[in-house]
Regions:
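Aromatic-Pro/Gly-enriched surface loop or interdomain linker
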Residues: 21-81, 85-89
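N-terminal secretory signal peptides that target proteins for export/translocation
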Residues: 1-3
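Short C-terminal domain-edge/linker segments immediately following a structured domain
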Residues: 60-66, 112-117, 143-146
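Sec-exported extracytoplasmic/periplasmic mature domains
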Residues: 35, 55-59, 87, 106-109, ...
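An acidic, glycine-rich "communication" segment
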Residues: 26-29, 34, 38, 43-46, ...
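Bacterial N-terminal signal peptides
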Residues: 6-17
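Short alpha-beta junction capping motif
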Residues: 81-125
């Protein structure tokens, strides 16, 4: 005997059709963290290129508009992913900004940091390491091991490519 539930769900799905999101915030936006000193936007087209690759390789729709956000902005928590770039030394964020970023990351937010100088030991690299140390003083910054799931979640990645190999 077929239950009413088993009949109702397929009929509902057929009537409704494919689920689509209609809100403006349904497309993935990646805001770039804006900071006071240093060059917080050395490559203005970088986010658009990243979002283009996300659209090309996944079913995620993106909003490629340029968006910069300060850590003090109340909408920070609306974005699951934020981007920080630079090539120069910058001053570590204020105590309240560090607290907001720490909370953002602790609650599941993702921060991608792009060292546009491409040099380990550059002024930007040193500033980032100081910032991470201030954010999470008990957790050392370590290289991701080759057996980490990030290297096999969507693609099998045999080697890291790009500027840093």
């Amino acid at each position: 005997m077929v239950s009413l539930f088993k009949l109702t769900i397929p009929l509902l799905l057929f009537k409704i059709g494919i689920a689509t999101a209609y809100a403006d915030y349904s497309n993935l936006s990646i805001p770039q963290i804006k900071y006071k000193d240093g060059d917080s936007n050395p490559h203005p087209t970088a986010i658009g290129s990243l979002l283009g690759q996300i659209e090309r390789r996944t079913s995620i729709e993106t909003d490629r508009g340029s968006l910069q956000i300060e850590l003090s902005h109340p909408n920070l928590y609306q974005y699951p992913f934020v981007y920080m770039a630079g090539s120069e030394e910058f001053e570590i964020f204020s105590g309240s900004e560090l607290e907001r970023l720490r909370n953002y990351l602790s609650y599941g937010g993702f921060l991608l940091i792009d060292n546009n100088s491409s040099n380990i030991g550059s002024k930007f690299d040193i500033s980032v390491r100081k910032m991470i140390g201030a954010l999470f003083p008990q957790i050392p910054l370590n290289k991701i091991s080759r057996d980490h799931s990030i290297f096999r979640s969507f693609y099998l990645i045999d080697r890291v490519s790009g500027r840093m190999q």
